[in-house]
């Protein structure tokens, strides 16, 4: 019953899609357990880039099952477009399975997302305006529409009318905005449901049957621990639980069936949108890292904020997600820097040092990073295939990251390609 969870340990964009794609070669089922099409991951296969937002990375292996679990909020229109995009590039989605319990994102969710964000003025949290938060709000309020409802014309019509009445009152009275007409949504989205019907099933049964049969199952998270609604930099977070614990809720698989948790991180840190970022760089070094690392959001296209590796963040991620292994990506981006830094602790204005990540944003704003400086390296390391092939300074950097986080490094990457991911220890035991 081997199962592996892949989680982002920073603020997303750590290269989870790349690592999931890499680990998928030894998995038989690959499942997504939370988030929506606000997440974006880029996978490079034979030099060709594929950008996905909803469909699990395992879709590139036609003999494997790819699952969108019940914890995902699904935009049917986006999903159909993604299936078409894959088909145009010679990739079939026949192995895709969608949970009938997953909640559906509808146009009123996206509109509400936009209006709520605009109303915050300079206190915006940096949402992607994909309707993710409002869809999860409806889910928690027990008024959401699930995929199973979308497939039943009578139920969909009844629930859509009820929800639209409530949402339109909110649009008109609270935001002085135009209402959405029932006819604008109903037929179009019912038809989307019919197009997706062949993929819809009880995915919890598929996942548990696979695990009980001894098959290898890989769970793929979106975003990262620091964007988790409970464990992240609240309120600058997403509306779901990217932490490993989110797997059990978002896939219908019990916690006793999770074998290993692989935390994915970059050799530096990045973040899209607003919110705390203790090691953020505003100088030429930051600009160099952004440009060399192509740090622009897959979903939004926005330039990402970048900074030094933060071991305080990483130890927090280790604790709340129970990391057993680490995948360290983008080491090559740091090539050419004379000195590289790692944050080892924070210092408060009163001189006190702390090694944990504060919950209070006010307390966090009072903290400055304490850095350990290491020699950089100038060599091109993109063709290195073993730890021994790395320059001594790069090897020392990799080892120091593992020591400070306190987790074994199972893979390190020196570029975006599959062949540039190097294994130090197999998480599958093969």
From Swiss-Prot:
Sorted UniProt keywords: Cytoplasm, GTP-binding, Ligase, Magnesium, Metal-binding, Nucleotide-binding, Purine biosynthesis
Native source species: Lactococcus lactis subsp. lactis (strain IL1403)
UniProt KW Glycoprotein keyword: no
Catalytic activity, reaction form: IMP + L-aspartate + GTP = N(6)-(1,2-dicarboxyethyl)-AMP + GDP + phosphate + 2 H(+)
InterPro entries, alphabetized: Adenylosuccin_syn_GTP-bd (IPR018220), Adenylosuccin_syn_Lys_AS (IPR033128), Adenylosuccinate_synth_dom1 (IPR042109), Adenylosuccinate_synth_dom2 (IPR042110), Adenylosuccinate_synth_dom3 (IPR042111), Adenylosuccinate_synthetase (IPR001114), P-loop_NTPase (IPR027417)
Active site feature: 13 (proton acceptor), 41 (proton donor)
Cofactor section: Mg(2+)
Cofactor binding note: Binds 1 Mg(2+) ion per subunit.
GO cellular component terms, semicolon-separated: cytoplasm
Residues involved in substrate binding: 298-304
Protein family per UniProt: Belongs to the adenylosuccinate synthetase family.
Record's subunit section: Homodimer.
A biological-process GO annotation: IMP metabolic process
EC number: 6.3.4.4
Primary localization: cytoplasm
Record: residues binding Mg(2+): 13, 40
Job description of the protein: Plays an important role in the de novo pathway of purine nucleotide biosynthesis. Catalyzes the first committed step in the biosynthesis of AMP from IMP.
Compartment list: Cytoplasm
Transmembrane parts of this sequence: none
Protein name: Adenylosuccinate synthetase
């Amino acid at each position: 019953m081997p199962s592996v969870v892949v989680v982002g340990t920073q603020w997303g964009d750590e290269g989870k899609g790349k690592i999931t794609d890499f680990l998928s070669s030894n998995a038989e089922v690959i499942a997504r357990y939370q988030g929506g099409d606000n997440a974006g991951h880029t996978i490079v296969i034979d030099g060709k880039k594929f950008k996905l937002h909803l469909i699990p990375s395992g879709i590139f292996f036609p003999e494997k099952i790819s699952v969108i679990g019940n914890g995902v909020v699904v935009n049917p229109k986006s999903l159909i477009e993604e299936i078409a995009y894959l088909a145009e590039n010679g990739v079939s989605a026949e192995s895709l399975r969608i949970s009938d319990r997953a909640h559906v994102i509808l146009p009123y969710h996206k509109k509400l997302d936009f209006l709520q964000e605009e109303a915050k003025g300079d206190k915006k949290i940096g949402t992607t305006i994909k309707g993710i938060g409002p869809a999860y709000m409806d889910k928690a309020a027990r008024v959401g529409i699930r995929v199973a409802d979308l497939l039943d014309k009578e139920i969909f019509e009844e629930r859509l009318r009820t929800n639209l009445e409530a949402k339109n009152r909110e649009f008109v009275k609270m935001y002085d905005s135009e209402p959405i007409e029932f006819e604008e949504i109903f037929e179009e989205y019912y038809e989307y449901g019919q197009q997706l019907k062949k993929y819809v099933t009880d995915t919890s049964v598929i996942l548990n049957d696979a695990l009980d049969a001894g098959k290898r199952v890989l769970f793929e998270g979106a975003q990262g621990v620091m964007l988790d609604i409970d464990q992240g930099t609240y309120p600058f977070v997403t509306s779901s639980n990217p932490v490993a614990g989110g797997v059990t809720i978002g896939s219908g698989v019990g916690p006793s069936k999770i074998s290993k948790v692989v935390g994915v991180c970059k050799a530096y840190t990045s973040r899209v949108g607003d919110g705390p970022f203790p090691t953020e760089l505003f100088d030429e070094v930051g600009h160099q890292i952004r440009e060399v690392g192509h740090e622009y959001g897959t979903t939004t296209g926005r330039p990402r904020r970048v900074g030094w590796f933060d071991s305080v963040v990483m130890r927090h991620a280790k604790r709340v997600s129970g990391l057993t292994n680490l995948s360290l990506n983008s080491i090559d981006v740091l090539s050419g820097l004379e000195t590289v830094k790692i944050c080892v602790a924070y210092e408060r204005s009163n001189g006190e040092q702390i090694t944990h990540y504060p919950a209070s944003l006010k307390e966090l704003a009072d903290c400055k990073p304490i850095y350990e400086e290491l020699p950089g390296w100038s060599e091109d390391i993109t063709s290195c295939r073993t730890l021994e092939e790395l320059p001594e300074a790069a090897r020392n950097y990799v080892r120091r990251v593992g020591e400070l986080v306190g987790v074994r490094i199972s893979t390190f990457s020196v570029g975006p390609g599959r062949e540039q991911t190097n294994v130090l220890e197999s998480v599958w035991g093969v």
